[in-house]
């Protein structure tokens, strides 16, 4: 029986079963799974077959924010999958391969890039990456320029903007990331004393 015909938030066991049900691994494969997500929004699972070393990552969007339980549009998962596929066409050396997108379960099955470290954490720890400027500028040029009005037909550009817009996530970014660190009017930030003179 296919239990994946209606959206539900998956557990680690569900994620392992999912990879077998949809043929990512064989039914006989001995798998182990773990949740590896540490963010506020989505659930991320890693499924590994130790015998072969094959592994995949599943990223699932749920109807509610992981951190606060606030409702959030599931379409964000489709947008991310489609953006990653486009970026993979323009800059394949910098983007994990997308194996499958499931619009019912809102799951992206992708290449496991766990051997890489989290850049944000590494930079916060003061690590220096000698090739970072070259690599990030190559990625940005290769993915952003071809998607601008300078290159794309203006009708196609408008269609993409319409397909990729997510007002709820824009609101989160605009408020939590770009406004509230400086205007703490909702008192949702932890403002360290050294930064108080920067925050209204």
Residue ranges and their predicted role:
Residues 120-138, 148-200:
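ATP-dependent phospho-/nucleotidyl transfer catalytic cores
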Residues 1-106:
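Conserved NTP-binding catalytic cores of kinases and kinase-like/nucleotidyltransferase enzymes
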Residues 88, 144-148:
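Protein kinase-like catalytic domain
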Residues 54, 116-120:
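Short, charged/polar, Gly/Pro-enriched secondary-structure boundary elements
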Residues 108-116:
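Short pocket-lining segment of the protein kinase catalytic domain that shapes the ATP-binding cleft
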Residues 62, 113-114, 182:
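Short, flexible active-site-adjacent loop segments at beta-strand->alpha-helix junctions, enriched
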Residues 102-103, 112-113, 155-158:
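Short, well-ordered beta-to-alpha junction loops that form the rim of enzyme active sites
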Residues 80-84, 133-144:
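Short, hydrophobic/amphipathic alpha-helical packing segments
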